[in-house]
Protein backbone atom coordinates (compact mmCIF):
# COMPACT_ATOMS: atom_id res chain seq x y z
CA UNK A 1 0.00 0.00 0.00
CA UNK A 2 1.36 3.42 -0.94
CA UNK A 3 2.04 5.55 2.15
CA UNK A 4 0.15 8.72 1.23
CA UNK A 5 -0.11 9.68 4.91
CA UNK A 6 3.56 9.29 5.86
CA UNK A 7 3.14 6.59 8.52
CA UNK A 8 6.44 4.87 7.69
CA UNK A 9 8.34 4.40 10.96
CA UNK A 10 5.72 6.26 13.03
CA UNK A 11 5.02 4.88 16.51
CA UNK A 12 1.28 4.18 16.63
CA UNK A 13 -0.92 2.87 19.45
CA UNK A 14 -4.31 1.36 18.58
CA UNK A 15 -6.87 0.33 21.22
CA UNK A 16 -9.63 -2.19 20.53
CA UNK A 17 -7.31 -3.76 17.99
CA UNK A 18 -8.34 -7.42 18.20
CA UNK A 19 -11.44 -7.04 16.00
CA UNK A 20 -13.61 -4.68 13.97
CA UNK A 21 -12.43 -1.16 13.19
CA UNK A 22 -9.48 -1.43 15.56
CA UNK A 23 -8.19 -4.54 13.80
CA UNK A 24 -8.64 -2.94 10.38
CA UNK A 25 -6.83 0.20 11.56
CA UNK A 26 -3.90 -1.74 13.01
CA UNK A 27 -3.57 -3.85 9.84
CA UNK A 28 -3.51 -0.79 7.63
CA UNK A 29 -0.91 0.94 9.78
CA UNK A 30 1.34 -2.14 9.68
CA UNK A 31 0.96 -2.25 5.89
CA UNK A 32 2.00 1.42 5.76
CA UNK A 33 5.19 0.66 7.66
CA UNK A 34 4.26 2.03 11.07
CA UNK A 35 5.55 0.63 14.35
CA UNK A 36 2.22 -0.54 15.75
CA UNK A 37 1.40 -1.33 19.38
CA UNK A 38 -1.97 -3.07 19.68
CA UNK A 39 -3.89 -2.72 22.97
CA UNK A 40 -6.98 -4.87 23.47
CA UNK A 41 -8.76 -7.29 25.82
CA UNK A 42 -7.84 -10.15 23.47
CA UNK A 43 -4.61 -10.81 21.62
CA UNK A 44 -4.30 -8.95 18.31
CA UNK A 45 -3.25 -11.43 15.65
CA UNK A 46 -1.49 -9.39 12.99
CA UNK A 47 1.90 -10.23 11.52
CA UNK A 48 4.36 -7.39 11.91
CA UNK A 49 3.09 -5.80 15.14
CA UNK A 50 5.63 -4.23 17.47
CA UNK A 51 3.60 -5.66 20.37
CA UNK A 52 0.16 -6.93 21.32
CA UNK A 53 -0.70 -5.83 24.86
CA UNK A 54 -3.69 -7.23 26.76
CA UNK A 55 -5.75 -4.57 28.51
CA UNK A 56 -9.34 -4.06 29.68
CA UNK A 57 -9.88 -0.39 28.81
CA UNK A 58 -12.66 -0.09 31.40
CA UNK A 59 -10.09 -0.49 34.20
CA UNK A 60 -7.64 2.25 35.15
CA UNK A 61 -5.02 -0.10 36.62
CA UNK A 62 -4.88 -2.16 33.44
CA UNK A 63 -4.40 1.00 31.37
CA UNK A 64 -1.52 2.02 33.64
CA UNK A 65 0.02 -1.43 33.24
CA UNK A 66 -0.34 -1.29 29.45
CA UNK A 67 1.29 2.13 29.15
CA UNK A 68 4.19 0.94 31.29
CA UNK A 69 5.02 -1.30 28.31
CA UNK A 70 4.53 1.35 25.62
CA UNK A 71 7.21 3.70 24.21
CA UNK A 72 7.99 6.99 25.93
CA UNK A 73 7.19 8.77 22.65
CA UNK A 74 4.00 8.14 20.65
CA UNK A 75 3.38 9.70 17.24
CA UNK A 76 -0.22 8.62 16.71
CA UNK A 77 -2.95 7.31 19.00
CA UNK A 78 -6.14 5.65 17.76
CA UNK A 79 -8.75 5.18 20.50
CA UNK A 80 -11.03 2.61 18.90
CA UNK A 81 -12.03 0.37 21.83
CA UNK A 82 -15.71 0.45 22.71
CA UNK A 83 -18.61 -1.46 24.26
CA UNK A 84 -22.25 -1.35 23.15
CA UNK A 85 -23.67 -1.79 26.64
CA UNK A 86 -25.73 -4.85 25.71
CA UNK A 87 -23.52 -7.19 27.73
CA UNK A 88 -21.91 -4.85 30.27
CA UNK A 89 -23.14 -2.60 33.07
CA UNK A 90 -23.50 1.17 32.85
CA UNK A 91 -20.20 2.12 34.50
CA UNK A 92 -18.11 -0.46 32.63
CA UNK A 93 -19.58 0.68 29.31
CA UNK A 94 -19.05 4.37 30.04
CA UNK A 95 -15.50 3.90 31.30
CA UNK A 96 -14.45 1.95 28.21
CA UNK A 97 -16.18 4.31 25.78
CA UNK A 98 -15.22 7.64 27.36
CA UNK A 99 -13.27 7.67 30.63
CA UNK A 100 -10.45 5.55 29.22
CA UNK A 101 -9.81 7.90 26.29
CA UNK A 102 -9.87 10.97 28.53
CA UNK A 103 -7.55 9.35 31.09
CA UNK A 104 -5.10 8.13 28.45
CA UNK A 105 -5.01 11.58 26.88
CA UNK A 106 -4.51 13.48 30.14
CA UNK A 107 -2.19 11.03 31.88
CA UNK A 108 -0.07 9.75 29.00
CA UNK A 109 -0.53 11.33 25.57
CA UNK A 110 0.03 14.90 26.74
CA UNK A 111 3.37 13.72 28.16
CA UNK A 112 4.44 11.46 25.30
CA UNK A 113 3.41 13.56 22.31
CA UNK A 114 4.63 16.79 20.79
CA UNK A 115 4.33 18.93 17.70
CA UNK A 116 3.24 16.96 14.65
CA UNK A 117 1.64 14.12 16.61
CA UNK A 118 -2.02 13.15 16.35
CA UNK A 119 -4.89 11.68 18.36
CA UNK A 120 -7.91 10.04 16.74
CA UNK A 121 -10.92 8.90 18.74
CA UNK A 122 -13.34 6.56 16.97
CA UNK A 123 -16.82 7.37 18.22
CA UNK A 124 -20.13 6.97 16.35
CA UNK A 125 -23.17 8.89 15.17
CA UNK A 126 -24.54 8.38 18.70
CA UNK A 127 -22.30 11.32 19.58
CA UNK A 128 -24.14 13.74 17.31
CA UNK A 129 -26.05 16.67 18.79
CA UNK A 130 -23.71 16.73 21.78
CA UNK A 131 -23.91 20.52 21.86
CA UNK A 132 -27.53 20.25 23.04
CA UNK A 133 -26.55 18.23 26.11
CA UNK A 134 -23.66 20.25 27.53
CA UNK A 135 -25.37 20.84 30.88
CA UNK A 136 -25.35 17.13 31.75
CA UNK A 137 -22.00 16.46 30.07
CA UNK A 138 -19.91 19.31 31.47
CA UNK A 139 -19.24 17.96 34.96
CA UNK A 140 -18.27 14.57 33.59
CA UNK A 141 -16.15 15.87 30.71
CA UNK A 142 -14.38 18.42 32.92
CA UNK A 143 -13.80 16.13 35.91
CA UNK A 144 -10.12 16.17 36.85
CA UNK A 145 -9.40 12.45 37.19
CA UNK A 146 -10.72 8.93 36.60
CA UNK A 147 -12.20 8.83 40.09
CA UNK A 148 -13.71 12.31 39.77
CA UNK A 149 -15.26 11.32 36.44
CA UNK A 150 -16.93 8.30 38.05
CA UNK A 151 -18.16 10.46 40.92
CA UNK A 152 -19.61 13.06 38.55
CA UNK A 153 -21.30 10.32 36.53
CA UNK A 154 -22.77 8.83 39.70
CA UNK A 155 -24.39 12.14 40.63
CA UNK A 156 -26.35 12.38 37.38
CA UNK A 157 -30.03 11.34 37.60
CA UNK A 158 -29.59 8.39 35.24
CA UNK A 159 -31.88 5.37 35.46
CA UNK A 160 -31.48 4.24 31.85
CA UNK A 161 -30.13 0.79 30.90
CA UNK A 162 -26.44 0.24 30.21
CA UNK A 163 -26.82 0.78 26.46
CA UNK A 164 -27.65 4.45 27.16
CA UNK A 165 -24.14 4.70 28.63
CA UNK A 166 -22.93 4.14 25.06
CA UNK A 167 -24.89 7.14 23.79
CA UNK A 168 -23.91 9.39 26.69
CA UNK A 169 -20.26 8.34 26.42
CA UNK A 170 -20.20 9.16 22.70
CA UNK A 171 -21.71 12.60 23.35
CA UNK A 172 -19.10 13.23 26.04
CA UNK A 173 -16.42 12.01 23.63
CA UNK A 174 -17.57 14.48 20.98
CA UNK A 175 -17.41 17.37 23.43
CA UNK A 176 -14.06 16.30 24.86
CA UNK A 177 -12.52 15.91 21.39
CA UNK A 178 -13.76 19.34 20.30
CA UNK A 179 -12.27 20.95 23.40
CA UNK A 180 -8.97 19.05 23.16
CA UNK A 181 -8.60 19.94 19.48
CA UNK A 182 -8.34 23.55 20.59
CA UNK A 183 -6.25 22.93 23.71
CA UNK A 184 -3.74 20.43 22.30
CA UNK A 185 -3.68 22.28 19.00
CA UNK A 186 -1.68 24.95 20.83
CA UNK A 187 1.08 22.33 21.20
CA UNK A 188 0.86 21.24 17.57
CA UNK A 189 -1.01 18.02 18.41
CA UNK A 190 -3.90 17.27 16.05
CA UNK A 191 -7.12 15.81 17.55
CA UNK A 192 -9.95 14.26 15.53
CA UNK A 193 -13.16 12.45 16.45
CA UNK A 194 -14.46 10.01 13.82
CA UNK A 195 -18.20 9.31 13.98
CA UNK A 196 -19.19 6.42 11.65
CA UNK A 197 -22.71 5.11 11.14
CA UNK A 198 -23.69 1.44 11.15
CA UNK A 199 -20.65 -0.66 10.25
CA UNK A 200 -20.11 -4.39 9.70
CA UNK A 201 -18.27 -5.20 12.94
CA UNK A 202 -18.77 -7.69 15.76
CA UNK A 203 -21.00 -5.25 17.63
CA UNK A 204 -23.48 -4.73 14.79
CA UNK A 205 -25.76 -7.58 15.90
CA UNK A 206 -25.87 -6.10 19.40
CA UNK A 207 -26.88 -2.70 18.06
CA UNK A 208 -29.53 -4.22 15.77
CA UNK A 209 -31.06 -6.07 18.70
CA UNK A 210 -31.15 -2.93 20.85
CA UNK A 211 -32.62 -0.84 18.02
CA UNK A 212 -35.34 -3.37 17.20
CA UNK A 213 -33.95 -4.72 13.95
CA UNK A 214 -31.61 -3.91 11.08
CA UNK A 215 -33.86 -1.38 9.34
CA UNK A 216 -34.55 0.47 12.58
CA UNK A 217 -30.80 0.70 13.22
CA UNK A 218 -30.06 2.02 9.73
CA UNK A 219 -32.85 4.58 9.98
CA UNK A 220 -31.33 5.80 13.22
CA UNK A 221 -27.63 5.77 12.41
CA UNK A 222 -27.15 5.67 8.66
CA UNK A 223 -24.44 3.59 7.01
CA UNK A 224 -20.68 4.11 7.11
CA UNK A 225 -19.15 4.25 3.62
Regions found by a protein language model. Name each.
Residues 58-73:
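Conserved Rossmann-fold cofactor-binding substructure of NAD(P)-dependent oxidoreductases
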Residues 11, 18-19:
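Conserved glycine-rich cofactor-binding loop
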Residues 128, 195-206, 210, 215-216:
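Short, flexible catalytic-loop segment of classical short-chain dehydrogenase/reductase
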Residues 85-87, 117-186, 198:
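Catalytic loop of short-chain dehydrogenase/reductase
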Residues 48-61:
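Rossmann-fold cofactor-recognition segment
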Residues 18, 25-27:
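N-terminal Rossmann NAD(P)H-binding glycine-rich loop of SDR-like oxidoreductase domains
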Residues 158-159, 163, 211-225:
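Catalytic Tyr-x(3-8)-Lys segment
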